Amino acid sequence: MIRKATEKDLSRIAEILVFVKRMKYRSIFQDDFYSFNILQVLPVAKKYADSDILDHMLVYDDGIVKGLIHIEGNEIAELYVDCFFQNKGIGSALIEYAKEHYPVTFLWAIEKNTDSIRFYEAHGFHLTDTKKLQEGTTEYLVMMQR
């Protein structure tokens, strides 16, 4: 079931964000200091608790929170599914729910994250000519629109 995220979900949300980012981005950014010293569950949970992000976040919860989508206006700001539950339709359910219930029209994807780009293309998004540097790195984000 897809529902609005609550404070009770914070630790699970942070856990998903930290571990999926480590698994997906470590080979792209090659920054172990960031991945294992800065990117930690407790600080991520605190950051989300101290902001209004939860007001814009949905989770996929079937008794276990397995994925999340963060929507800011027309943008899909984040979409992550726990590594243990990927390729089971959870990300697809989240993005299709967002497309149906929110005016989402664009997102940014890491240019070298070809798996996510293919996923978004399968859900009606296409690459544009717009790109920007990921802050503090030499890697680019590419804009995708639907």
Provide a role label for each language-model segment.
Residues Y120, F125:
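Conserved active-site tyrosine of GNAT-family acetyltransferases
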Residues E75-Q86, A109-I110:
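A short, internal acetyl-CoA/4′-phosphopantetheine-binding micro-motif in the GNAT/acyltransferase core
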Residues I95, E100-K112:
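Conserved GNAT acetyl-CoA-binding A-motif
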Residues L107-R118, L133-T138:
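Conserved beta-strand-loop-alpha-helix junction that forms the acyl-donor binding cleft
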Residues V18-K46:
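Conserved GNAT-fold acetyl-CoA-binding loop/helix
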Residues F85, G89-Y97:
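Conserved acetyl-CoA pyrophosphate-binding loop and the N-cap/start of the following alpha-helix
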Residues M1-E15:
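A short beta-loop-alpha structural element at the N-terminal edge
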Residues L54-G67:
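Conserved beta-hairpin
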